[in-house]
């Protein structure tokens, strides 16, 4: 979730800003911009009066879009986004790296690791040593995102409705992600979301509002993780990407960044979310003018399911071979490990279930130039958290 500060960086007892979506405490990142009708920010006494200690750091009240007083209206929207890295350091090539290593050793009073003949061979492209641009192997220049929105709303004499559907597809910056048959090691996120807001006049004095939101999100990443540290830690001269006999290559000190990113399989996270709340507004003017009551029942359920498809891969360690003059004339390769099939494991990573009931009785009356507004509020909630357990 984004970090939001209403009253500065500090917070009282670490509570943070209280976010209410249609009167229910929920995460603001569960919302799409197109489904927001209004946002109200409360702070200081305004938030304390209504929400007590929980509102000491401010309250953000978000109201989702409701059905309008009109016939059926349909909207369709499509967004295409191109993302590019803000800045990526330019990495040294093999010649620059070899010269830098020699200079560092010289400053410590040690002998050079690479001879002038080795460096000249690197410049000429005749050296057996590698000159791999790991940044180019791992990253591509841009990522492409797609978003499709569909909504329709309207009303009749007794009901107002609003339906919003959203599909999002995001692909990451990794390169060479289709090296394996049957699966990709790209960072990908796909999400499908549906929201329905209904409001009905049950009687002349009773209004019912029901809000439903469901979302399915699938996130995929390489089993080796998404860290870019291997790009910066592995020098271009360490080893070729592949060994001459096939399979990945590396040396004794440094790993093969592309093997970590593309060779170990993938993992997927499936998140399912359901938000539901029902609110009844009752006008009690028949009892006494200015009296009203409100009752809200809420049920939220979110779960994370983690699927992992991992495998081991064979690799060959490259070792320089020196000629009689001490120059690097070749690379020898020693093979380790074996290529294995994808394994499979699936588990419920976590699940959160939350029920909440909220009631309010309100009385308003004008006395000449004075206005009286009194409210009594009752709330009770229950939150249940399930930890990880295997589903097989």
Predicted regions and their residues:
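Short loop/edge segments at beta-strand edges and connector loops
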Residues: 43
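Small-side-chain secondary-structure face that scaffolds active or pore-lining regions
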Residues: 166-191, 221-227, 241-243, 271-273, ...
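Membrane-proximal, glycine/serine-rich, low-complexity loop/turn segments characteristic
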Residues: 1-18, 24-29, 46-273, 279-285
């Amino acid at each position: 979730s984004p970090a939001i500060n209403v009253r500065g960086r500090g917070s009282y007892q670490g509570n943070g800003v209280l976010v209410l979506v249609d009167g229910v405490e929920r995460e603001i990142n569960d919302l799409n911009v197109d489904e927001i009708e209004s946002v109200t920010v409360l702070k200081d006494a305004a938030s304390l009066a209504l929400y007590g200690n929980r509102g000491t750091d401010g309250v953000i009240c978000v109201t989702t879009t409701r059905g309008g007083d009109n016939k059926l209206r349909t909207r369709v929207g499509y967004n295409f986004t191109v993302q590019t890295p803000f800045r990526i350091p330019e990495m040294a090539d093999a010649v620059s790296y070899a010269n830098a290593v020699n200079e560092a050793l010289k400053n410590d009073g040690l002998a050079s690791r690479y001879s002038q003949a080795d460096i000249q061979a690197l410049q000429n492209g005749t050296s057996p040593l590698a000159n791999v641009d790991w940044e180019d192997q791992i990253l591509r220049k841009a990522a492409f995102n797609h978003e499709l929105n569909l909504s329709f709303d309207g009303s009749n004499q007794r009901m107002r409705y609003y339906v919003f559907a959203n599909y999002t597809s995001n692909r990451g910056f990794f390169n060479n992600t289709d090296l394996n048959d049957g699966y990709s090691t790209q960072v990908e996120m796909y999400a499908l979301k549906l929201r329905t807001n209904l409001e009905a006049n049950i009687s002349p004095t009773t209004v019912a509002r029901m809000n439903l939101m469901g979302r399915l999100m699938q996130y995929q990443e390489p089993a080796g993780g998404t860290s870019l540290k291997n790009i910066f830690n592995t020098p271009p001269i360490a080893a070729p990407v592949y060994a001459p006999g096939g399979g990945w290559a590396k040396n004794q000190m440094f790993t093969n960044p592309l093997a970590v990113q593309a060779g170990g399989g993938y993992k997927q996270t499936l998140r399912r979310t359901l938000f539901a709340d029902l609110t009844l507004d009752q006008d009690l003017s028949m009892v006494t003018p200015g009296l009203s009551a409100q009752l809200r029942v809420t049920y939220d359920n979110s779960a994370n399911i983690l699927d992992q498809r991992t495998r081991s891969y064979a690799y060959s360690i490259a070792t320089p071979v020196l000629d009689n003059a001490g120059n690097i004339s070749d690379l020898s390769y020693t093979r380790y490990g074996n290529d294995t099939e994808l394994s499979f494991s699936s588990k419920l990573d976590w699940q959160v279930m939350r029920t909440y009931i909220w009631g309010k009785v309100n009385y308003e009356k004008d006395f000449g130039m004075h206005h009286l507004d009194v409210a009594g509020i009752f709330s009770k909630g229950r939150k249940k958290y399930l930890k990880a357990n295997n589903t097989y």
